[in-house]
């Protein structure tokens, strides 16, 4: 998979030099992510690609197209190939390994970016909705772009999203055949909310090379936190990396 992505990036880098409509970047970083489940935190050294041609883009595991694009408003139709969560029983803490495997879903959705120029030209409101065979999500975020210098970007954000009952029941519910160890009761949660805040920063050494860092924190409503297989805590995702823009 990584060889395939690098080959695609190499091809797009050649095309980008010949066509201004092509844009591409690749980021190599290191990140840690608290698990919502009763298991170990995730540590990874990901390669993150971002490729676009006119109104079509590939960003990480998401592909999409903008069909409305104005100075203050744009709308995007997208497909997320790794939506949701993935966990095996063998990766859970001792006493919680009787659960069935939870898998990612593929989701299709709509999202928009709306500039709130009445308050600030750097303030953006971003609602979105997505649906997959394991449930739906709907939410919105508010982000601010601050540039203390031409080569420095700082962007704080806050957001919330709603997870449907079908979604929360699949990822956080407990069926009878999963009982065992510390899991003593079935659990059938209703729809839930997630509240989050984040901070992103990027420093450009040159036009093509930059360093970035980010921290994201989220908190789930009680429907998720009361599940026997989840941790009742703030979920933190921290990372940093180097980015090359073609």
Summary of predicted features, one role per range:
Residues 55-58, 73, 118-125, 150-154, ...:
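Repeated loop/turn-to-beta-strand initiation elements of outer-membrane beta-barrel proteins
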Residues 52-54, 68, 113-119, 145-147, ...:
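Structural signature of outer-membrane beta-barrel channels/translocons
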Residues 26-32, 51, 60-62, 77-83, ...:
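Transmembrane beta-barrel strands of outer-membrane/channel proteins
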Residues 33-36, 95-98, 126-129, 182-187, ...:
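Extracellular loop and loop/strand-boundary signature of outer-membrane beta-barrel proteins
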Residues 1-23, 227-229:
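Cleavable N-terminal export/targeting peptides
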Residues 135-139, 143-224, 229-232, 244-246:
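Outer-membrane beta-barrel transmembrane domain signature
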Residues 22, 41-47, 52, 71, ...:
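Residues that define the transmembrane beta-barrel architecture of outer-membrane proteins
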Residues 19-65, 166:
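Short glycine/proline- and aromatic-enriched beta-strand/turn motifs that initiate or cap beta-hairpins
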């Amino acid at each position: 998979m990584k060889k395939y992505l690098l080959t695609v990036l190499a091809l797009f880098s050649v095309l980008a030099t010949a066509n201004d409509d092509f844009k591409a970047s690749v980021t190599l970083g290191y990140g840690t992510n608290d698990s919502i489940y009763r298991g170990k935190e995730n540590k990874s050294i990901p390669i993150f690609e971002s490729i676009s041609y006119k109104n079509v883009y590939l960003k990480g595991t998401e592909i999409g197209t903008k069909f409305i694009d104005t100075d203050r408003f744009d709308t995007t139709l997208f497909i997320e190939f790794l939506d949701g969560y993935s966990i095996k029983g063998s990766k859970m803490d001792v006493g919680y390994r009787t659960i069935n495997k939870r898998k990612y879903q593929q989701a299709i959705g709509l999202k928009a970016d709306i500039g709130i120029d009445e308050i600030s030209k750097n303030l953006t409101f971003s609602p979105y909705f997505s649906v997959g065979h394991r449930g739906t999500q709907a939410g919105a975020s508010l982000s601010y772009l601050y540039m203390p210098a031409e080569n420095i970007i700082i962007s704080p954000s806050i957001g919330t999203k709603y997870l449907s009952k079908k979604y929360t029941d699949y990822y956080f519910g407990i069926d009878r055949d999963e009982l065992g160890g510390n899991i003593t009761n079935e659990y059938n949660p209703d729809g839930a909310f997630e509240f989050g805040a984040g901070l992103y920063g990027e420093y450009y050494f040159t036009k093509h090379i930059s360093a970035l860092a980010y921290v994201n924190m989220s908190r789930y409503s009680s429907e998720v936190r009361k599940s026997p297989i989840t941790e009742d805590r703030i979920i933190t995702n921290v990372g940093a990396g180097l980015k090359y823009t073609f």
